[in-house]
Amino acid sequence: MQIVMFDRQSIFIHGMKISLQQRIPGVSIQGASQADELWQKLESYPEALVMLDGDQDGEFCYWLLQKTVVQFPEVKVLITATDCNKRWLQEVIHFNVLAIVPRDSTVETFALAVNSAAMGMMFLPGDWRTTPEKDIKDLKSLSARQREILTMLAAGESNKEIGRALNISTGTVKAHLESLYRRLEVKNRTQAAMMLNISS
């Protein structure tokens, strides 16, 4: 597993490198402090997990994530932040952000978040966002099959895996997902999975 840490504190990168390498076999961690440096590393590892320092300026982080996801659509993102309730964090979730972890979390929590994000699963703090009534109503309006598919999607299953488990074609899975996205007013798998996670 390749991780690129974009962080203003080299000591945080160093500490995380030592700690995660002790807990995740075969993990390789590189640090970057400039946007060009990050993109250069992602040229070599376009499917890497990016750990972004969320304590930097919100507008800068938004810009960086937007640019990064356009250039490297396969990249997965984990954000570390002292305050996980910053408004901009909710606005960037659709930029392949799969995990948001408080910077003072234990190493075990970071390892769990990294492994979850690497598998395409969401990892968000329990109190990360208050659940709007609308989200719950939208989820209740889904059919039983759509809820089933959404649950599997949130667990990181691919369309092919969902189709195999439910004995339906991948085309049918895709059609269900498109209908589900419209119903929930979301644009992608990550946003749909997040709605399920925050309402449960």
UniProtKB/Swiss-Prot annotation:
It comes from the Bacteria. Residues 135-200 form the HTH luxR-type domain. It holds the Pfam family GerE. Signal peptide: none annotated. Residues 159-178 bind DNA. Keywords: DNA-binding, Transcription, Transcription regulation. GO terms for molecular function: DNA binding. CDD domains: LuxR_C_like (cd06170). One of its GO terms (biological process) is regulation of DNA-templated transcription. This is Putative HTH-type transcriptional regulator YhjB. It comes from Escherichia coli (strain K12).
